[in-house]
């Protein structure tokens, strides 16, 4: 990200998309990180977090809107990377503003023989789960420089969202396996979905 910011006029801006100054491009990027975290953190602290279906649906909708919006501001490559920066920033903030502080609070309460707040443990667990399921998508985005046919595809934002869903399904299989629950059908589903997506991209490539 530092390299992109340092060469923002070349690596971030695509005048065919939007004619931005280097300063404006950096400002938009940093603003997207802050706003995305505030929105995500607010949702996690709301009652929506108690309804997995509504929470996941809202997060997927926001992922789609953010991905689409970024492709209308930055060049395709940095737009892709920006989604990874946003998710990575949220993961980092989860660890240092929620997970670690809450765990330290619980430890301190235990040392003082005080009853600790169970909501702190639950919040830390939820954020940890979010980070866990985001891992594969972030890794994919980190390597996206090798997939120019995806990065510069007309529907790159939609492809990214679909890969996010597929990668989360794959991650779910490995999470279950870590608990000695073997559900190969989940892994097969993610693999088949990935093959179907790849086939569609190949057929309808730019």
What do the PLM-derived regions correspond to, one by one?
Residues 1-205:
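Polytopic transmembrane helical bundles with strong interfacial aromatic enrichment
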């Amino acid at each position: 990200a530092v390299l992109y910011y340092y060469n923002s006029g070349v690596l971030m801006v695509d005048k065919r998309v939007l004619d931005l100054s280097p300063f404006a491009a950096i400002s938009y990027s940093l603003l997207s990180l802050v706003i995305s975290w505030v929105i995500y953190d607010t949702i996690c602290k709301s009652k929506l977090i108690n309804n997995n279906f509504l929470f996941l649906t809202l997060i997927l909708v926001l992922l789609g809107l953010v991905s689409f919006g970024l492709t209308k501001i930055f060049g395709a490559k940095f737009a892709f990377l920006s989604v990874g920066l946003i998710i990575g920033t949220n993961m980092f903030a989860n660890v240092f503003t929620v997970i670690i502080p809450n765990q330290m609070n619980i430890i301190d309460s235990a040392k003082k023989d005080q009853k600790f707040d169970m909501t702190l443990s639950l919040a830390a667990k939820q954020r940890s789960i979010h980070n866990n399921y985001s891992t594969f998508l972030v890794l994919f985005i980190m390597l996206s420089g090798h997939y120019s046919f995806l990065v510069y595809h007309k529907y790159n934002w939609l492809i990214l969202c679909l890969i996010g869903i597929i990668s989360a399904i794959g991650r779910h299989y490995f999470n279950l396996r870590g608990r000695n629950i073997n559900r190969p059908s989940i892994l097969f589903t993610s693999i088949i979905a990935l093959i179907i997506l790849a086939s569609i991209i190949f057929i309808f490539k730019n």
